[in-house]
UniProtKB/Swiss-Prot annotation:
Protein name per UniProt: dCTP deaminase
Keyword Membrane tagged: no
Source species of the chain: Rickettsia rickettsii (strain Sheila Smith)
Gene3D superfamilies noted in UniProt: 2.70.40.10
Record GO terms (molecular function): dCTP deaminase activity; nucleotide binding
Protein family (similarity comment): Belongs to the dCTP deaminase family.
Entry's Gene Ontology BP terms: dUMP biosynthetic process; dUTP biosynthetic process
Amino acid sequence: MAIMSDKWIKEAVINHSMIRPFAEKQVRVHNKEKIISYGLSSYGYDARVSNEFKIFTNINSTTVDPKNFSEYNLVDREVDVCIIPPNSFALGRTIEYFKIPRDVLVICVGKSTYARCGIIVNVTPLEPEWEGHVTLEFSNTTPLPAKIYANEGACQFLFLKSDQICDTSYADRQGKYMKQVGVTLPLT
């Protein structure tokens, strides 16, 4: 597998609508204010987080169970700045909608701006022929409240192209998160 360049990413967007909307250069300023960057980079794409968040809460005294997940574990917010409580967790989603080619696997890494503040972003790999908004998991590892800025960069996606096309893609096996829109909770 090889990591793909900005040139390849642009071509995949033009020919296959791989990322929508797409910023073909790094955006660092919006309305004359500095923001956390997003857009195309040398070997990846920095995606933005939308203003939809689900923040973990303990007000209902429930247990987090990935096999039987309860929405009572979360508080929904549509905000420009999401405040994650100390040592807590929030879900968001990318503004961008992704359509992954059959011979590509995508991995996500966090942005150093957030990592240096103790905020970790986690996403499982985007598999061949998966498509949808990416649900982002934000962990606040600090003992203080932490901010996530909607409509700004949140993570970077790296595109790995295989020398062989897979026998079975995510679409072929009808993966449960196929074509997800919005923040998607755990499914079993």
